[in-house]
Amino acid sequence: MRSIMVQSAKTDSVNQQTIEGLKLQIKKLNSKAGQLKMDLHDLAEGLPIDYQNLTALAAETYEIYRHLDELKSQLKSLEKNHDMGY
């Protein structure tokens, strides 16, 4: 019984570290995503000047937001499992 409790405490600690790590990653990506969004907006406002950069910047912005969405889904799942005691 004691072994199960120790293992559960270790798992809980690992899950909490994972959750905190994901939150930190999300915070950093949110900042970068916001900057890319502003850059994309500025580029769009200046069109047709620098139109050659539009595709690359849009792709980078898309990829950041896709990754951010993926991390948020992982975080939500981990928090749900953590709250349920898994």
Curated annotation (Swiss-Prot):
This is UPF0437 protein Ava_4254. Gene3D superfamilies: Helix hairpin bin. The keyword Kinase does not apply. Keywords: Nitrogen fixation. One of its GO terms (biological process) is nitrogen fixation. Belongs to the UPF0437 family. The keyword Secreted does not apply.
